[in-house]
Amino acid sequence: MLYILHENDQWLAPFRETFTEMGLPFSEWHMASFLPDLTVEPPLGVFYVRMSASAHTRGHSGVPELTAGVLCWLERHGRCVINGSAALDLELSKVRQYQALMAHDLPVPLTYAARSPEQLLSLARNMSCPFVTKHNRAGMGLGVERFDGFDAFELRLDA
């Protein structure tokens, strides 16, 4: 049996269609509404994870973090998990993604991380223009914005 952990019905549609055409039995665990009993052993099968860090943009705040706990449960019981906890960990952090890429000598754009508007402004003052900002967890390009100068960036933060 294939178990699909996800929180986005739209993304799953082509997989659902293909698995049905193939006659592959599967069960969906929609993690925004389903929670397995973590006090018992998980069912036998293959667990395919389609979780996205951008779940909050669909009203599913906290679902990736809950899914991380479920993945630990599955992995602790030796289940076959495709896109398991290591993949989800990378999905949840641009900083960790970039660090993993750099560990394999893959080029990444010059990247800074900040937690507050004050930190963003401090970093931006020392950056050459133009520069691009991106949210850590946004999805589908949400929050990607180009700034041609510091003043425009400062105005955007004040808005």
Task: Enumerate the predicted regions with their spans.
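Conserved N-proximal alpha/beta basic substrate-recognition cap immediately N-terminal to
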Residues: E7-L110
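Active-site nucleotide/adenylate-binding loops and adjacent lid/helix of ATP-dependent enzymes
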Residues: M1, A86-A159
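Nucleotide-activated donor-dependent transferases that construct or modify glycoconjugates
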Residues: M1-E7
